[in-house]
Amino acid sequence: SDGKTIDGMSLKRIENLIDALKDESYQPKPARRTYIPKKNGNMRPLGIPSIDDKLVQEVLRMLLEAIYEGSFENTSHGFRPKRSCHTALIQVQKNFTAAKWFIEGDIEGFFDNINHDVLIGILKERIADDRFFRLMWKFLKAGYIEDWTFHRTYSGTPQGGIISPILANIYLDKLDKYMKEYACQFDRGDRRAMNLEYKRYSRKIWWLGTKLKQTKDKDTRKELIDAIKQHQKNRMHLPSVDEMDEGYRRIKYVRYADDFIIGVIGSKSDCEGIKEDI
């Protein structure tokens, strides 16, 4: 940052900032690039904006959140109100229980590689304000300072910027909606077929139970009860449905920031097809 704090910002400075925004003379400063360690041992670049830029970005973030938050998919959990990695894990725990295959995705270098033209095109689908877009272009092209050297930005939105998370969600909302539509096309069957072996044990238990009701002899009743218990014990170790039923397919999807996971009820070839399509 520029070493200044919002607490120390005077009313006059804020008024000057508003005037600069009104006459479009406002020019964001290059972000200060720093690095923080990642879990895998690599370093993650952060772009720290100036105090003035933080303030303006926060206003833009509030505007974008008011426009887009209500239309984001329920499968998106990163950088959203009342959502977190914990809500993402809860959704996985709740919806992925029957999944047999998993596809994990991590969009490498996502924040640094967001296509500016594509991003602006997505924003223009909902926003019609030329002044807004002129300001947005200024932020996207502001560049960054690293080791006292200025670097231009041709793509991406810097991690560390207040506006970057919601821009990322707006960008990746296209993926979320694609996966929602993909699931509608992929899913097949109302329910899985019953496991034939499970069904056979159930029929035996029913038949023995019927016979038990009709039997008075104590020794015979004991034999029937023991047989029923044994069949119930054997059935407990079996799934009630056919887990390899080709007539039943489902796909589940959850995203947190630029990481996503897909759970698949289907075949290995189904998974390979999904990877190709994505």
Predicted regions and their residues:
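Non-catalytic terminal/accessory segments
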Residues: 1-278
